[in-house]
């Protein structure tokens, strides 16, 4: 199995390391790769859109020709996980977006960009997961905020206290936080099971 981490900007290497460790823990043969060109898409069983800066990721996905084929693959059922800026890229509606920004618009949520403020307002906190009783340490860095679920297809996947901070819709996972910045691979393992 190959998992493509869109490697244009953001915390790509951390996702590659977390994915490779999760594959090993699941006993699955495979690897995570830096996904930079459309021709690599035929190799992958799943895609991760990392954190970073959503405007830059959007622009580079369009410039490299990844934008439209990635959107089509997701719409056709390819598993995808977006974290932080990746969540913004997946979202149907984005508050605070500039008119020239394009998003994949495949996940039925409304998000607010940079809802947690500046870099100095970043924090870590225990997050409750729908698929495991043990808390997960969520790392929130200038994170977007899920402000509304726009359809019944979207299911909460993670909560910070009583607020939804992660969602799942069929083959799509969107997270406000960065699961790749911890040593805990449970979120990556859960995601990879979608591609098995």
UniProtKB/Swiss-Prot annotation:
GO terms for molecular function: glutaminase activity; pyridoxal 5'-phosphate synthase (glutamine hydrolysing) activity. L-glutamine binds at residues 52-54, 113, 141-142. Its EC number is 4.3.3.6, 3.5.1.2. The keyword Lyase applies. The active site is at 84 (nucleophile), 178 (charge relay system), 180 (charge relay system). Transmembrane segments: none annotated. Keywords: Glutamine amidotransferase, Hydrolase, Lyase, Pyridoxal phosphate. CDD domains: GATase1_PB (cd01749). The keyword Nucleotide-binding does not apply. Pfam families: SNO. GO terms for biological process: glutamine catabolic process; pyridoxal phosphate biosynthetic process; pyridoxine metabolic process. GO terms for cellular component: cytosol; glutaminase complex. It comes from the Archaea. It catalyses: aldehydo-D-ribose 5-phosphate + D-glyceraldehyde 3-phosphate + L-glutamine = pyridoxal 5'-phosphate + L-glutamate + phosphate + 3 H2O + H(+); L-glutamine + H2O = L-glutamate + NH4(+). Pathway: Cofactor biosynthesis; pyridoxal 5'-phosphate biosynthesis. In the presence of PdxS, forms a dodecamer of heterodimers. Only shows activity in the heterodimer. Belongs to the glutaminase PdxT/SNO family. Catalyzes the hydrolysis of glutamine to glutamate and ammonia as part of the biosynthesis of pyridoxal 5'-phosphate. The resulting ammonia molecule is channeled to the active site of PdxS. NCBIfam families: PLP_synth_Pdx2 (TIGR03800). This is Pyridoxal 5'-phosphate synthase subunit PdxT. It comes from Pyrococcus abyssi (strain GE5 / Orsay). The gene is pdxT.
């Amino acid at each position: 199995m190959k998992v493509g981490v869109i490697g244009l900007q953001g915390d790509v290497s951390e996702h590659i390391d977390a994915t490779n460790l999760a594959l090993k823990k699941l006993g699955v043969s495979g690897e995570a790769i830096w996904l930079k060109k459309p021709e690599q898409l035929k190799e992958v069983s799943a895609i991760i859109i990392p954190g970073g800066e959503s405007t830059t990721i959007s622009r580079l996905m369009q410039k490299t020709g990844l934008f439209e084929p990635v959107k089509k693959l997701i719409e056709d059922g390819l598993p995808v996980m977006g974290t932080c800026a990746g969540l913004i890229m997946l979202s149907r509606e984005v508050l605070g977006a500039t008119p020239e920004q394009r998003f994949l618009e495949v996940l039925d949520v409304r998000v607010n960009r940079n809802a947690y403020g500046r870099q100095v307002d970043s924090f870590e906190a225990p997050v409750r997961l729908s698929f495991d009783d043990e808390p997960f340490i969520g790392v929130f860095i200038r994170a977007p905020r899920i402000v509304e679920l726009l359809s019944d297809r979207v299911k909460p996947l993670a909560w910070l206290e009583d607020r939804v901070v992660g969602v799942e819709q069929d083959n799509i996972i969107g997270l406000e936080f960065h699961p790749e910045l911890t040593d805990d691979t449970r979120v990556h393992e859960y995601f990879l099971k979608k591609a098995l």
